[in-house]
Each structure stands twice: as structure tokens, then as C-alpha cells.
From Swiss-Prot:
NCBIfam families: PRK00714.1-5 (NF001938). It holds the Pfam family NUDIX. Residues 8-152 form the Nudix hydrolase domain. Belongs to the Nudix hydrolase family. RppH subfamily. This is RNA pyrophosphohydrolase. Its EC number is 3.6.1.-. It comes from Sphingopyxis alaskensis (strain DSM 13593 / LMG 18877 / RB2256) (Sphingomonas alaskensis). Coiled coil: none annotated.
Length: 158
């Protein structure tokens, strides 16, 4: 039996992408039948810095390239979440207990037609812009505290 508390956190970068109207991008996860929505995020590759990873993940998940965004802020600290026990063996080969995430607030300077979630690394089956107050109820319960922290930190800048 694996002691989950001894597993490391997976290094990750995430993007709170805000449009010019102050609404935030969320995508509905493709790998589950539940109403699981989230902001773009993903692992940091070996030797990659968090900012480059965030821009890469944004492109892989939304088709938005770095020239269409302005970086407004970087989170003051890393955010952490733990997976529920029943998911630890199913995610990332059971090597991680959850994620430690560097987050970036980015302003989307493009048009909605620039967004294409049907990418080679498709993660989302649907997407939409939402008000900050809507985000928490869309997110899976084990990530809600993390998202509350992001909204508190980035909300005034959105």
C-alpha cells in the first residue's frame, strides 16, 4: 500500500485567462462525464520555467499562442491541491499526490474565433467565458480552495 502523504506534488503551471470584458475562460474537461470545468493548466517539463509552461499549456489546450496574450501577474506563491484518494492511482501513473501550481493572470487580446479547443492535445470538450463569481461552483470540489485563493489574488486585476 502506498502512503499518499509521501508522494510528491506534480509541478504545474496554470493560466487565469481574462478577456477585455473581465470574464474568465473555463474549459469543460474531456476525460470525464461529469461537469468538471477548469482553467488551462498542465505540467512543467524538465528544464522548463513556469511562464513558458503556462504559455505552452495555453496553446496546447486552447490554440491561443503567446502573441495573443499579455501577462498581467504571476501568483505570489505556489498553490497546492491534493487528489482524492480514489483518483491518486488513476492520475499521472500514481506518482503524485496532487499538484503544486504556479499561476499567471493573462489578458486575452484576440477574438473568440482565435480559440480552438480541438487541438492535438485536446483537453476540453467545451469552453466559455464566465464571471469570477461563477467559477467556484463549476470546479471539482477538491480544487475549490485553490480557485478561491486565485480569485482573491487575481480578482482585483481581472
Amino acid at each position: 500500500m502506498i502512503d499518499h502523504d509521501k508522494l510528491p506534488y506534480r509541478p504545474c503551471a496554470g493560466v487565469m485567462l481574462a478577456n477585455r470584458d473581465g470574464r474568465v475562460f473555463v474549459g469543460q474537461r474531456l476525460d470525464t462525464s461529469s461537469e468538471a470545468w477548469q482553467m488551462p493548466q498542465g505540467g512543467i517539463d524538465e528544464g522548463e520555467d513556469a511562464e513558458k509552461a503556462a504559455i505552452r499549456e495555453l496553446g496546447e489546450e486552447t490554440g491561443i499562442h503567446g502573441g495573443l496574450v499579455d501577462i498581467i501577474a504571476r501568483s505570489r506563491e505556489e498553490y497546492f491541491y491534493d487528489l482524492p484518494d480514489h483518483l491518486i492511482g488513476k492520475m499521472w501513473g500514481g506518482k503524485y499526490r496532487g499538484q503544486r501550481q504556479h499561476w499567471f493572470l493573462m489578458r486575452f487580446m484576440g477574438e473568440d474565433s482565435d480559440i480552438d479547443i480541438h487541438t492535438r492535445h485536446q483537453e476540453f470538450r467545451a469552453w466559455r467565458w464566465v464571471d469570477l463569481g461563477e467559477i467556484e461552483k463549476l470546479i471539482v470540489p477538491f480544487k475549490r480552495a485553490l480557485y478561491r485563493g486565485l480569485i482573491e489574488e487575481f480578482g482585483p486585476l481581472v
